[in-house]
Amino acid sequence: MVKKNIRADEISSIIRQQIEQYNDEVTVVNVGTVFQVGDGIARIYGLDNVMAGELLEFADGTVGLALNLETKNVGAVLMGDGLTVQEGTAVRGTGKVAQIPVGEAFLGRIVNALAEPIDGKGEIQTTETRLIESNAPGIISRRSVHEPLQTGLVAVDAMIPIGRGQRELIIGDRQTGKTAIATDTILNQKGKDVICVYVAIGQKASSIAQVVNTLTERGALDYTIIVAATADSPATLQYLAPYTGAALAEYFMYTGRHTLVIYDDLSKQAQAYRQMSLLLRRPPGREAYPGDVFYLHSRLLERAAKLSDQLGSGSMTALPIVETQEGDVSAYIPTNVISITDGQIFLSADIFNSGLRPAVNVGISVSRVGSAAQLPIMKQVAGTLKLELAQFAELEGFSQFSSDLDQASQNQLARGQRLREILKQSQASPLSVPDQVASIYAGTNGFLQKLAVNQVRDFLVGLREFLDKRKPEYLEAVNSEKKLTPKVKDILNSAISEFLDEFLAS
């Protein structure tokens, strides 16, 4: 072995070089130990410097969320099945709260509650991230709701109008068509530059697949993001899914775009949160829900807004869905969400079973801010429709107990029956504004009185085709003027009369 001689001047330069390369950074890792685990909950000892809502990393790779910060331990909920987490497992605090990637690349994709793709189409390439939980826009950041968001449903657009930036609750028993209204609204946004986010919470995978198929067939998936937390997902993911959907929509809202978010449904989220809270031994309140279940939904729905011009005029419209039991809207979660939202569309099982679909109960459905956003032409043509239908429903109930009605009442009943036919619509067939206006105008101006009740729907379908093919000036007039001008009235009067003669003659 050759011994190398180092000169004295080299020694000093080597020492200087080593000193320059010395890194004095000390990495402090916050580590604890699991002492109890089960039912998706882990209790951890030794995690002293942890934030509420901080992400925790377990030794086996499982991720958890710190929710209970107690004097001697931390209660965390697991985001996986947690089967490999056991007593003594090391846990590391990440120092970060839950955040997800966001961006244009999410359009047309199906993701889970952590925004990870689950549609088998590969990774989603994006550079930006957003916190899952972020503050709602303040008062100064907002503008009042003034632009319409058309659902394509006559019953909603005419009588319970929705504006961009509004929160409108869809409430009703199971199997009354709540999801159908939401998906029809997504279909109707085609070509209107509205980004849609559909959040499925605690639903069967087959139900979500059905929605995906409907949107794909109609070409609506291109402008839609689906966030799915299925019924077999851990309660933590069902709890987080709506906030993930809101964060994805917020990205577009703050870039000046218009978005629509559907939460289907918040009853399941509340149940998942109740499960987590009870397992964390938080004190139960009414219906065993924790005391902050109102805040659970209010902080989510307050994120929907119409932004001011200074912030780019973007908007986020929320359509939360809540399921009732036997039509009981006075239960805890329904009353909470009704008080947070700007109105509700109430779907009735009785109306649904009677054959009127969408099964909207016009009498107790309301839109508190939507009238300011309703198109002038719709306001003019449908102004008295809600009142007329409410009076008709009352008279119809009364007529069941009385056989001899005067002529005026019989006329009102006949008119009401025909007006009700206007509201009937097949699923996944939203109507444009000109088509809706023509249908309502024909009904409110007495043109349908010459028809039998069972002929009304066929007549209206034919009328829409007639206007489309033979009266192109009608479409131009409605789209350009947006008001029921004498010109639009003249076109409608002549077209409806002309088609009515043809229809009756055939």
Swiss-Prot record:
Its EC number is 7.1.2.2. ATP binds at G172, D173, R174, Q175, T176, G177, K178, T179. It is a peripheral membrane protein. The record marks S365 as: Required for activity. Keywords: ATP synthesis, ATP-binding, CF(1), Chloroplast, Hydrogen ion transport, Ion transport, Membrane, Nucleotide-binding, Plastid, Thylakoid, Translocase, Transport. It catalyses: ATP + H2O + 4 H(+)(in) = ADP + phosphate + 5 H(+)(out). It is an enzyme of class 7 (translocase). It holds the Pfam family ATP-synt_ab_C. Its main location: plastid. Belongs to the ATPase alpha/beta chains family. NCBIfam families: atpA, PRK13343.1. F-type ATPases have 2 components, CF(1) - the catalytic core - and CF(0) - the membrane proton channel. CF(1) has five subunits: alpha(3), beta(3), gamma(1), delta(1), epsilon(1). CF(0) has four main subunits: a, b, b' and c. This is ATP synthase subunit alpha, chloroplastic. It comes from Pleurastrum terricola.
